[in-house]
Structure formats: C-alpha cells, structure tokens
C-alpha cells in the first residue's frame, strides 16, 4: 500500500454527492483537493470543508462540456495546488425517457457532459502525468454503461462510451505508469438519484456516496505496480 499524503487530486462534479464525499475522504488521507463544478457556491463550500481537515483546497466553476472553461479551471486549480496526481472524472447528468421522447438536444447534452466532459478534463491533465510518468485517473461510469434499459438509451450510450474511452486510454498510457480505471456503481443515494426518484423512496438502503469514496481511497492506495481496471459496486439489498 502507498500513502496518499501530499498528493493532489482534481475532482469534477465536486460540489455535492459523490464528488463531495470523495473530496472529504481523500482530504482525510492528507490529499490536497481541487474541485470543479458548475455552481461556484457549492464547490466553494466543499473547499472550506476540505480545508477544515488540514489540507489545501482550490476550486473553480466550469461546465465540463466546454473545453475553454475546463482549461481555465484546471489552470486556476494548478496555480494554487501544483500538478495533479489524481483525477476523478465524476461530473455527470442523466435524463430518462423513450428513444423517441428525448429530443436531439437532450441527447447531445448528455453525451457532451458525460463523455466529452471526461475527454476535456483528461486532456487538460494528462500531458503532465505523462511527463512525470505517474498518475491516477478514475472515471465514474455506471451499471447503465454495462446494460441498457428501455428508458436509458441516451444515458447508457454515454456511460458505455466512458467505459470504451477508459479501456482504450488505459492501454495507451499504462506504459507511462499511469493507472486508468472505471467504476460502474449501481444506484448511489446522490442528490441526482434522489431528485430523479431512483432510490425507490429508500435512499438509506442503497449505496451512499461515502461508500464509493471509501472504495476509491482504497484503490488509490494500492502499490503503483498494480491497479484495478474496472470495478462494479452494488447495493446489497436496496
């Protein structure tokens, strides 16, 4: 196992839910935290929580589907915290409906955020990881990225694509000692899941953001010579 102390992590979708839980879990391990989110007030609040744990924090507001905003946000975080050792691509959106019921604009927005967001942020961070011959990238996919359902065509398409991107990038950069992994959790009791009524009214029985964060910390602490390519975490009895 390796220590994570004094490393720097960048987390997208860092203002609530999985992003917030991961930021706090990593901060407890001595990791400095950079946060990117659409709502400045949310990521600023989490940054203050992180600082209270005795590590450095920086935040920037950006829409991950906008490459220029992403590049500016990453530069802003790096100016305060230095190079990024760990990237958690967590930002995502969902909208469910029949194939003919979702508009082309709705489809495109889901793909832009869930897939192109991963692309833009990774592209902004990866060159320095290659130069240093070290780094960790964890992309949050979903069980919906492993199987489709009648009303998840757009969301599943985006999350299947994240798995393909992750697998391909992993094969490309492992020679640089960069570990690229994907997580495929079932329903997590995040703000988004609760708002979309995906927890069947029992959010306390399904996986919590803190559960996923705990797993990511353990995965990142593995000796750098090994990594977990893909992991699926499920709720036991939702």
Curated annotation (Swiss-Prot):
NADP(+) binds at residues 10-34. It comes from the Bacteria. Its EC number is 1.-.-.-. The active site is at 155 (proton acceptor). SUPFAM superfamilies: NAD(P)-binding Rossmann-fold domains. One of its GO terms (molecular function) is oxidoreductase activity, acting on the CH-OH group of donors, NAD or NADP as acceptor. Keywords: Oxidoreductase. Substrate binds at residue 142. The keyword Oxidoreductase applies. InterPro entries: NAD(P)-bd_dom_sf, Sc_DH/Rdtase_CS, SDR_fam. Belongs to the short-chain dehydrogenases/reductases (SDR) family. This is Uncharacterized oxidoreductase YoxD. It comes from Bacillus subtilis (strain 168). The lineage of its organism: Bacteria, Bacillati, Bacillota, Bacilli, Bacillales. The gene is yoxD.
């Amino acid at each position: 196992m390796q220590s994570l102390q004094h490393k720097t992590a960048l987390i997208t979708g860092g203002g609530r839910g999985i992003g917030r839980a991961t930021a706090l879990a990593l901060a407890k391990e001595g990791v400095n935290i950079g946060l990117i989110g659409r709502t400045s007030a949310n990521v600023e609040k989490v940054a203050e929580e992180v600082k209270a744990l005795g590590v450095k924090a920086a935040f920037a507001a950006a829409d991950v589907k906008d490459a220029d905003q992403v590049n500016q946000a990453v530069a802003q975080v790096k100016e305060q915290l230095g190079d990024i050792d760990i990237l958690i691509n967590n930002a995502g959106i969902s909208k469910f409906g029949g194939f003919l019921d979702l508009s082309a604009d709705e489809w495109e927005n889901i793909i832009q955020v869930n897939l192109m967001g991963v692309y833009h942020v990774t592209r902004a961070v990866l060159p320095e990881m290659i130069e240093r011959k070290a780094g960790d990238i964890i992309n949050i996919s979903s069980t919906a990225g492993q199987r489709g359902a009648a009303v998840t065509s757009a969301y599943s398409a985006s999350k299947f694509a994240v798995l393909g991107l992750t697998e391909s990038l992993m094969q490309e950069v492992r020679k640089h000692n960069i570990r690229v992994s994907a997580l495929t959790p079932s329903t997590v009791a995040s703000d988004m899941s609760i708002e979309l009524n995906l927890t069947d009214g029992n959010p306390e029985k399904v996986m919590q953001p803190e559960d996923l964060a705990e797993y990511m910390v353990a995965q990142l602490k593995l000796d750098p010579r090994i990594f977990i390519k893909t992991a699926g975490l499920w709720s036991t009895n939702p």
